[in-house]
């Protein structure tokens, strides 16, 4: 028995020690001669015939897009390897020192990842997937959503225009008639990493409402240039800007700013976006502005609304105006979240600005100033931070501590001291302001605590806006206390949200705003997704006390149609009720009609269209006797690059976007509303900056005879970039052919038929030259390759409309 075990062991060891190439006996194949067989690519396990292959890139089970990878000859005739370009490897997020130390091969064109201990690269040919496995210690951060700076793209040089046009005509027996035409937007120019932006507003009023005649106004609210500095994870801005500060109150400036950009940091150290909620009585337009500059505008339907997609860099106090269709307006302010200024251990973050304040009012002053702030990460997740703001006759300095509490969020506390010589009295006053901030999203209990902050200021504390401002233009009431809370909680049967803003002043009445929303979804019999919403908002200040209550019920009717009923109560004011019907066709078109009664009976009709190149809507309201209102809105954007002019739907404030090419194939749909135009281009807008973004083809909506070999592309863009990706789309047909060479012999079994220019494989030659071509495009140049050195070009392919089960002879010359 022992000898037998020893014999078996020796055999197994010898098998493990030696590995021979697989040899095929072509006699088992039904072919005429070995000369017509090319089986070299099948003789070695894991061997890939050199050439270009479109593959899915997977690194540690994370998808990194689909792209063409070149396989090169290795050290022997039976060896090949995947050439991984630096630009691709840079997106993996390796530690910078490791990435720089990796060997470059093939004249520096390829990065050798196998130099990393325990790394492996395997090409699963049957799946078209290049699987890369790397030790976790190789990565700079263990975060699947973090993309390293080396992988960020500045995009294309080009120009852009985001614009919105709103027209309203109102006829009223009580307030007169008016016609208002408004437009606002952003024009921009991208040159390398620089972004030049100009925000504009234009308005023309005519009519008798309010005693107005014809009025026209045009202004550039902001003209500035900026660029990302990835090497120091900072943003440089020149021109008209706003002080971006975690320590001091924000104000408009004209000058230069250099600051760390937390969007370049790992996601867990990035800020929260502001949340704005309220109530609309009609199809209203909600405008969010800061010191006269429109930051955001949208149309909302009657009832409760919530705006959560403002840029996370927006800070300070925002002015929100709800423009109702009957001409009335409601306004309120929202204090945006101030996330604690945290830094990792040993990291220094900074913000420096110099220039002059602007928008200070007619009687204001514009002294030169310098502002700077620093934050340094200490051990045990502590951060020490502070800042200085200095101008002639003014000095303010702050110091504070922040702490990362891990699963419990983050907290900070600071004190700011100001010393100012007042212009009107030449008196020098000194005061302090104390602040505590806290923020956290509690995933475990399904609660989002957007912001909780408290600030107390002495009577003699003076912020910079108060120091330079005009008392006739801006309120210089000295703030005493201020705090804000935004809380959302989802239960199994109920969703709730709560917001509260409170401000008190030393020489003025306090102001408060309270909001509460409750939402419930349930089923009655076979009718599912019945929604009930209850909202209450109250605003209190020295001038008025406004309370609004809203109750809404919506019942789905099937086929994307819905009935709804609402009851609203405004105090002071009357109670109004409405009943409506709405429908969405699922392709971007929606409309609604509803009627109701309040002070008067009224009826409203609305229609909206969301296309890949524009957004448009129109609405009409009348009570049949005292007023009529007609409103239209059109939003669109233009991108101009070396690829031409491309229109797309509603970019915003010159934000980041992606120009997509589909190789001239029209009507290719992508996730969302984007769809390639007749020239094969489209634009995806609203992309996050410095983060991974996946552009995806909607395979289910591909046109007939169209295929895309790389339906998913992954990239990361810098702020304001016009990115570019190409999807290898093709419109073609299938063909059944018999391939023969110029000497009359058939093309060898196993040869690969590829597109001459893209190297995309469209078929593999079978027995007797019989080949089934998939996705062949009329007029395409196809070649057959075998044995690494043999190549012939296919002559004329059979016509597209010929369908037969008999192979069509095609010469390969």
Across the structure, where does each feature detected by a protein language model lie?
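Feature captures outer-membrane beta-barrel proteins of Gram-negative bacteria and organelles
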Residues: 152, 181-192, 214-230, 366-380, ...
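Post-signal-peptide, soluble extracytosolic/periplasmic N-terminal scaffold domains
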Residues: 9-12, 19-270, 571-639, 649
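Short, acidic Ser/Thr/Gly-rich low-complexity loop/linker segments typical of extracellular
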Residues: 69-70, 673-682, 758-770
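A short, amphipathic beta-strand motif
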Residues: 57, 276-278, 658-662, 733-742
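Short Pro-Gly-centered beta-turn/loop motif in secreted/extracellular proteins
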Residues: 75-84, 310-315, 681-707, 719, ...
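Transmembrane beta-strands of outer-membrane beta-barrel pores
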Residues: 138, 167-171, 193, 202-206, ...
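Membrane-embedded beta-strand positions of outer-membrane beta-barrel proteins
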Residues: 161-163, 198-200, 236-238, 350-354, ...
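Short, ordered, surface-exposed loop/turn motifs in non-cytosolic proteins
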Residues: 49-71, 284, 664-674, 743-758
């Amino acid at each position: 028995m022992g000898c037998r075990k020893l014999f078996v062991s020796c055999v197994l060891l010898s098998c493990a020690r030696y590995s021979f190439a697989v040899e095929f006996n072509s006699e088992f194949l039904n072919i005429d001669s070995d000369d017509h067989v090319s089986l070299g690519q099948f003789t070695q396990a894991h061997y890939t015939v050199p050439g270009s292959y479109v593959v899915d890139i997977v690194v540690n089970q994370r998808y990194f897009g689909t792209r063409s990878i070149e396989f090169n000859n290795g050290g022997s005739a039976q060896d090949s390897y995947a050439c991984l370009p630096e630009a691709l490897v840079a997106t993996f997020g390796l530690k910078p020192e490791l990435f720089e130390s990796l060997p470059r091969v093939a004249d520096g064109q390829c990065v050798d990842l196998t130099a990393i201990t325990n790394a492996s690269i395997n090409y699963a040919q049957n799946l078209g997937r290049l699987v890369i496995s790397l030790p976790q210690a190789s990565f700079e951060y263990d975060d699947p959503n973090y993309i390293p700076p080396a992988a960020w793209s500045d995009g294309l040089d080009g120009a852009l225009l985001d614009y919105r046009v709103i027209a309203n005509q109102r006829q009223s027996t009580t307030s007169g008639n008016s016609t208002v035409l408004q437009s606002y937007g952003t024009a921009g120019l991208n040159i390398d990493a620089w972004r030049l932006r100009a925000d504009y507003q234009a308005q023309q009023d005519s009519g008798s409402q309010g005693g107005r005649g014809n009025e026209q106004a045009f202004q550039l609210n902001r003209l500035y240039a900026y660029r990302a500095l990835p090497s120091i994870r900072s943003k440089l801005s020149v021109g008209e800007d706003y002080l971006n500060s975690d320590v001091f109150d924000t104000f408009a400036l004209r000058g230069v700013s250099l600051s760390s950009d937390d969007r370049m940091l790992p996601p867990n150290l990035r800020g929260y976006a502001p949340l704005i909620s309220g109530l609309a009585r009609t199809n209203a337009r909600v405008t969010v502005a800061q010191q006269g500059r429109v930051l955001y505008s949208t149309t909302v339907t009657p009832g409760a609304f919530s705006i959560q997609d403002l840029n996370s860099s927006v800070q300070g106090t925002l002015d929100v105006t709800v423009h109702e269709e009957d001409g009335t307006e409601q306004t309120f302010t929202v204090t945006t979240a101030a996330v604690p200024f945290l830094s990792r251990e040993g990291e220094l973050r900074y913000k420096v600005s110099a220039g002059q304040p602007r928008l200070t009012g007619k009687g204001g002053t514009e002294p030169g100033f310098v502002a700077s702030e620093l934050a340094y990460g200490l051990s045990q997740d502590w951060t020490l931070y502070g800042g200085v703001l200095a101008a002639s006759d003014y000095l303010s300095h702050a110091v504070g501590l922040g702490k990362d509490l891990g699963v419990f969020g983050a907290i900070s506390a600071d004190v700011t001291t100001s010393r100012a010589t007042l212009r009107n009295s030449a008196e020098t006053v000194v005061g302090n302001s104390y602040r505590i901030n806290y923020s956290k999203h509690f995933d475990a209990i399904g609660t989002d605590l957007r912001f909780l902050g408290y600030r107390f200021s002495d009577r003699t504390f003076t912020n910079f806006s108060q120091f330079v401002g005009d008392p006739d233009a801006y309120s210089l009431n000295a703030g005493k206390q201020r705090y804000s809370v935004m809380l959302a909680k989802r239960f199994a049967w109920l969703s709730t949200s709560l917001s509260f803003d409170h401000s008190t002043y030393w020489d003025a009445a306090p102001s408060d705003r309270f909001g509460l929303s409750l939402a419930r979804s349930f089923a009655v019999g076979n009718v599912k997704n019945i929604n009930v919403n209850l909202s209450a908002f109250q605003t209190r200040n020295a001038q008025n006390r406004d309370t609004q209550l809203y109750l809404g019920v919506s019942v789905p009717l099937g086929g994307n149609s819905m009935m709804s009923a609402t009851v609203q109560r405004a105090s002071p004011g009357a109670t109004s009720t409405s009943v409506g019907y709405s429908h969405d066709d699922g392709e971007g078109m929606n409309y609604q009609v509803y009627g109701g009664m309040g002070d008067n009976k009224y009826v409203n009709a609305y229609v909206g269209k969301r296309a890949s190149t524009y957004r448009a809507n129109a609405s009409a309201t009348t009570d049949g006797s005292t007023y009529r209102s007609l409103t239209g809105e059109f939003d669109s954007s233009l991108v101009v690059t070396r690829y031409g002019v491309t229109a797309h739907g509603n970019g915003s404030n010159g934000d980041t976007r992606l120009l997509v090419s589909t190789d001239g194939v029209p009507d290719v749909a992508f996730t969302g509303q984007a769809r390639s135009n007749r020239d094969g281009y489209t634009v995806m807008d609203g992309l996050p900056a410095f983060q991974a973004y996946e552009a995806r083809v909607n395979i289910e909506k591909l046109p007939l005879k169209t295929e895309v070999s790389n339906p998913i592309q992954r990239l990361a863009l810098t702020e304001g970039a016009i990115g570019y990706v190409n999807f290898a789309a093709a419109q073609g047909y299938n063909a059944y052919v018999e391939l023969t060479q110029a000497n009359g012999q058939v093309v060898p079994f196993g040869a690969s038929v590829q597109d001459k220019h893209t190297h995309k494989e469209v078929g593999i030659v079978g027995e007797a030259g019989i080949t089934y071509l998939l996705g062949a495009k009329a007029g395409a140049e196809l070649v057959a390759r075998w044995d690494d050195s043999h190549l012939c070009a296919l002559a004329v392919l059979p016509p597209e409309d010929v369908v037969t089960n008999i192979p069509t002879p095609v010469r390969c010359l």
